[in-house]
Amino acid sequence: MLGILVVLCLIPAADVTENKILVAQRPLLIVANRTATLVCNYTYNGTGKEFRASLHKGTDSAVEVCFISWNMTKINSNSNKEFNCRGIHDKDKVIFNLWNMSASQTDIYFCKIEAMYPPPYVYNEKSNGTVIHVRETPIQTQEPESATSYWVMVAVTGLLGFYSMLITAVFIIYRQKSKRNRYRQSDYMNMTPRHPPHQKNKGYPSYAPTRDYTAYRSWQP
């Protein structure tokens, strides 16, 4: 009778030990490039064939970031709309890949592993979690470059505008001087010679020379 009681007491204890899930996480993960890889190592010696692993954010695990479920034939994964997360199952570990993270998502994250089927339903006790610290991407180095390039463009544009105005003004002045010189030359060309008022017009054109008849008279007999 005593032997039967000992056997009955040992069987439940063995079941509890066999179906227990233990999870191990690294305590700190620093993210500098907005991409994080969180590995959840677990041990399970039960007979479950369908599992679910999920990643939770916050000390109270209130936010489920993403999850992955798998069995012998298929794998299913889903992510919260506020996160970019994907889960991968690999033997005795689940890998959660997160990308495009922001500094506001810095928090403590917990892995939860569940044996869904067949019964009994088992899940791990809450682990110590992993603090994911997301560093803000520095953008101050880009501002001076953009400002400098902007002012360089403004200076070049202003200089080109000044030179174009200067060239236009020189061209206008040169054109006005050329017109004045043409007017003066046309006035000189239109002037005709005139006889003094005391000379009489002998019927010859103004350009014809006058003949001297005294030379002819000296030859008369």
From Swiss-Prot:
Region span, Disordered: 188-209
Signal peptide (from-to): 1-13
Disulfide bridge positions per record: C40-C111, C66-C85
Annotated glycan sites: N33, N41, N45, N71, N100, N128
Keyword annotations: Disulfide bond, Glycoprotein, Immunoglobulin domain, Membrane, Receptor, Signal, Transmembrane, Transmembrane helix
Bilayer topology annotation: Single-pass type I membrane protein
Transmembrane segment boundaries: 150-174
Principal location listed in the UniProt entry: membrane
Parts of the chain on the Cytoplasmic side: 175-221
Pfam families reported in the protein's UniProt record: V-set
Quaternary structure and interacting proteins, as annotated: Monomer.
Protein name per Swiss-Prot or TrEMBL: T-cell-specific surface glycoprotein CD28 homolog
Species for this entry: Gallus gallus
Gene name for this UniProt entry: CD28
